Amino acid sequence: MELELKPGTTSANLYQTNTAKERYYCNFGLQRKHEHSVESAGVTISGIDTPAEARENKVDSPGSIFEPRNHPYFFGTLFIPQIVSTKEKPHPIVTGFVAVARIKQAALTR
């Protein structure tokens, strides 16, 4: 499924683009009527399904990547990044997590 990534978000920075393709294994999603509540609670909806790619039974559900503001690295996704990640070509979210973990570990061992 094609996703539009919000520029300037951690998601867009990790993918190094404003669009991405992901595979879904669910029909769940955020209902548009709750979008404002999520955003006002400090969570950015940083990846949005493109309308032409709507999943079966998915009703009015735009959000596919969620990230809290003011957190070094946390994601909620409706897809499973590790499923398509391989040793030869790791998923951007997986490599980003490893990079942040290394920085954190280095800070703890100083």
Task: Tell me what each language-model feature is.
Residues 1-110:
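Amide-donor transfer/coupling interface in amidating biosynthetic enzymes
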